[in-house]
UniProtKB/Swiss-Prot annotation:
Domain HPt intervals: 24-129
Organism: Saccharomyces cerevisiae (strain ATCC 204508 / S288c) (Baker's yeast)
Protein name, UniProt field: Phosphorelay intermediate protein YPD1
UniProt-listed PROSITE patterns: HPT (PS50894)
Annotated GO CC locations: cytoplasm; nucleus
Quaternary data: Interacts with the response regulatory domains of SLN1 and SSK1.
Gene3D superfamilies: HPT domain (1.20.120.160)
Entry annotated with the keyword Ligase: no
């Protein structure tokens, strides 16, 4: 398993998109707003899978989808967590780090000042069958989903600062 990037945003990637703005940030800002809507919808779909069907293939697909769109915008920590969800859905990984370890990798920890990093956590109380070999993967995906929500919140803070508006 690769290590999570220390920067929330890869500005080299995002600046390529921003360069298309031509003195008007509406283009790049519009892409970010679309991503925000897309991410919230995808998080909800993942949660429904964890609460309902518990389909690892669908969770893999959702993780892959969000990994691609977040990576394209340079939102590299979200992309990293979504890749873990994808790999857990494929049973290619068997571990997910705890939240404190991941938060401690941030290059600028001041972004978390005043934020309750556990505020939006869904309880990791998904109903699993102890005899189901997929149970551990579902529990780890639930843990990763909570982390992706935190990374999403941190990315929104950074992007809101850049665009000087609440995104």
């Amino acid at each position: 398993m690769s290590t999570i990037p220390s920067e929330i945003i890869n500005w080299t990637i995002l600046n390529e998109i921003i360069s298309m703005d031509d003195d008007d940030s509406d283009f790049s800002k519009g892409l970010i707003i679309q991503f925000i809507d897309q991410a919230q919808t995808t998080f909800a779909q993942m949660q429904r899978q964890l609460d309902g069907e518990k389909n690892l293939t669908e969770l893999d697909n959702l993780g892959h989808f969000l990994k691609g769109s977040s990576a394209a915008l340079g939102l590299q920590r979200i992309a990293w967590v979504c890749e873990r969800i994808q790999n857990l859905g494929r049973k290619m990984e068997h571990f997910f780090p705890n939240k404190t370890e991941l938060v401690n990798t941030l290059s600028d920890k001041s972004i978390i000042n005043g934020i309750n990093i556990d505020e939006d956590d869904e309880e990791i109380k998904i109903q699993v069958d102890d005899k189901d070999e997929n149970s551990i993967y579902l529990i780890l995906i639930a843990k990763a989903l909570n982390q992706s929500r935190l990374e999403f919140k941190l990315a929104r803070i950074e992007l809101s600062k850049y665009y000087n508006t609440n995104l």
